Amino acid sequence: MLPLKQSEEALKDKRRLRWACRRGMLELDVLFEPFVDQAYDELSEEQKAVFRRLITCDDPDLFAWFMGHQKCEDEELAEMIRFMLSRVKV
């Protein structure tokens, strides 16, 4: 169990992350928010870094990648997208 201070920091970080996941497109919100709630804590630190990088991408790119309209050329991001799609049921 995390000491109280670390636990509070982790909760604060998760709130910041949830806020950062808010998108301008509902189609993306229904992917990102449940993923953060259901699966983010299970990721390795490396995977968390990839996820944080993913949420800095532009909404049109994210939408095209998640909907399969375009291929994400960054293999780490593409793997995270596949993982997210396998975990979040919409």
From Swiss-Prot:
Pfam families: Sdh5
Compartment(s) where it occurs, according to its Swiss-Prot or TrEMBL record: Cytoplasm
Gene Ontology process terms (BP): succinate metabolic process
Keyword terms of this UniProt record: Chaperone, Cytoplasm
Ranges that cross the membrane: none
A GO-annotated cellular component: cytoplasm
Chief site of localization: cytoplasm
Superkingdom of this protein's organism: Bacteria
PANTHER family reported in the protein's UniProt record: FAD ASSEMBLY FACTOR SDHE (PTHR39585:SF1)
Task performed by this protein: An FAD assembly protein, which accelerates covalent attachment of the cofactor into other proteins. Plays an essential role in the assembly of succinate dehydrogenase (SDH, respiratory complex II), an enzyme complex that is a component of both the tricarboxylic acid cycle and the electron transport chain, and which couples the oxidation of succinate to fumarate with the reduction of ubiquinone (coenzyme Q) to ubiquinol. Required for flavinylation (covalent attachment of FAD) of the flavoprotein subunit SdhA of SDH and other flavinylated proteins as well.
Sequence similarity: Belongs to the SdhE FAD assembly factor family.
Protein name: FAD assembly factor SdhE
Natural source organism: Idiomarina loihiensis (strain ATCC BAA-735 / DSM 15497 / L2-TR)
Organism taxonomic ancestry: Bacteria, Pseudomonadati, Pseudomonadota, Gammaproteobacteria, Alteromonadales
Gene: sdhE
